[in-house]
Every structure is written in C-alpha cells, then in structure tokens.
Amino acid sequence: LVSLGLEYTIVPFYRMLHLDPGMLGGILALDMGGYQLCKELALDPAIGRYGGIIVGATLGCTITFTIPVGMGMLGEREKPLFAKGILAGLSALPVGILVGGLLCGLSIEKLLIQSLPVFLLAVLLILGLSRFPDGMIRGFRVFAEIIRGAGTIGIALGAFSYMTGVQLLPEMAGLDEALGVVSSIGIVLLGSLPFAEILQRLLKKPLEWVGEKIGLGRLGTAGLLVGIVSALPVIADMKQMNEREIVMNAALLVCGTSMVAAHLGFVLGVDAPATGALLAGKLTGGIAGVWMAWQIMKKTESSRDR
C-alpha cells in the first residue's frame, strides 16, 4: 500500500531529479517495512539494498523507534541530554552509511549523489531537534503510531490470506515469508543479551580502563556494549546515568543499536551477503557518534567550569 502510494506521489519527483526512489524506504527501520519498500521501489538493486539495509538500520531506526521510544521512557532531566546525544549521532551518520554503502558495491560518486536526500533529512532533524524539540518529538510519536498501525493491518491481511487462500493485495508478501524473517531475528536475539553479558565479564578490566579515559562509569561503559544489542535496556538505565554517559550512549544508538541482535537477525534472514556491510556501517557510525558526543561533552563541561 505504501509502495503504491509513493509510486504516484514522490517517486516521479525523485526520478525527475535522477535519484533512485529505492532510497525512500530508508526513512523506515529496515525491520519495520523499510527494506521491503526500498527493494520494491529501487531501479538499481544495489541502491535498494543500501537504502533498505544500511540507511534503514541507522536513520530509519532512529526516526521510527529510538527517538519516539526514548522520549516516551525518559524523564525531564534525561530528555535534553538524550536529544543532544541523538544530535551527535546524526552528525556522525554519514560516516556509517558511506562505509556501508561502499561495501554494498556502490561507487563513491553514486553513493554521494543518492545519499543527498538522507544527508538533507539528517540536517533537518538536527535543526528541528535543537530548535523545536517538543514539536519534533510529538511528530515522531505520531509517525511511529502510523507505522505500527500499518503493520497491524498488514498482519491482519496476511493472516486472512493464510487462512482463506484469498489474496486481497496481489503485491503483498505471504505470511510464511514474514514469519521466516521473524524466526531468524528471534534466533539471534536468544543469544545476544547473554553474549553482551559475557563480553562485559571478559572485558571488565579493559572496559574500566576505557571508561576512565573517556569519563564514563560502570553503567556508562556497560551501556555502550548493551546498546549494540538493544536500545531499550540502555534507555531504561539512563535515569541512573550522569550527563556525559546519557549523551554518549544516545549517540551510539543512532547507528549502533541492535547491531548484533534484531538487525543482524533480519539481514541474515533476507539478504545474508549484506551482513558485512551492515556490521561495518553500524560499527563505524556508532564509534563516530560516540566520539562526536565525547567532543561535545568535553567542550560543554569545559565552558561550564570557566
């Protein structure tokens, strides 16, 4: 339904600008319809893969999940700090998506041209969050509810088709295909949090050393590890974090969240050869975001001390 709607509205405008409409789906998280939308709209399969997996796993996930969920869970003290971290992560977003795009097989010239709308949207988000945070958050929540509603309708239609054999929407993927992807995500999730816990125990001393160097306590350094598994535990722990820890962990979530969990499981289920591009893009973008947040907080704390 979304694909058909875009075909008659925004897609002609994209083609007029010589941009591949496959990039449009990148505003949705890859596992919330972004990947399928990119693949359906793309003129070049490589652009569909890049938009659906790399952009959808970073910018799309931030728009449809991380921001609305984070702002809904956090208190008044944490919200401005969380927003500052998201701004830092968005500033570093080009690093992650360019690395991922190159590993998807795109030339640097094509990558830069096709990514222009993504960069523009990231700039608009940065301006909006810094100047009109309350209005932006309300907009994100409404957008997320629309996506959830569309997903619920899709599940209902898929279930009806599965039980009756009547295909109401010929272009819609079958329920069996969707459940296969969900199973792949579930299998990866089974071991992801235990994996993060094992890493925390094995790397306790190195993590403490890194934390001392960048000014993070135990909870802050643990959040950087848990964040690559899931955003939810990290956001929940932010109520107990200090300012620097909140900002740096929020910055990581823009590109790094679910890197070794839901996003990895999804890509293994739909396009396994793109796994390397996904991991490299999310890792480099996440590290760049944390570094950007670290620099911002050093300047903020330095100016405060004067």
Predicted regions and their residues:
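Membrane-water interface regions at transmembrane-helix termini and the short interhelical loops
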Residues: 71-77, 100-108, 125-140
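Hydrophobic core segments of alpha-helical transmembrane domains in multi-pass membrane transport
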Residues: 1-3, 90-101, 117-131, 149-162, ...
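Membrane-embedded alpha-helical segments and adjacent helix-loop junctions characteristic
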Residues: 1-41, 132-140, 150, 157-236
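Alpha-helical transmembrane segments and their helix-start/interface "positive-inside/aromatic belt" motifs
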Residues: 77-85, 137-151
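Interfacial loop-to-helix junctions that mark the boundaries of transmembrane helices
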Residues: 106-116, 139-144, 172-181, 273-280
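Membrane-helix boundary/juxtamembrane motif in polytopic membrane proteins
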Residues: 142-147, 215-218, 241-248
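C-terminal transmembrane helix pair
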Residues: 49-102, 119, 229-306
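Structural signature of hydrophobic alpha-helical transmembrane segments
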Residues: 21-26, 48-62, 109-124
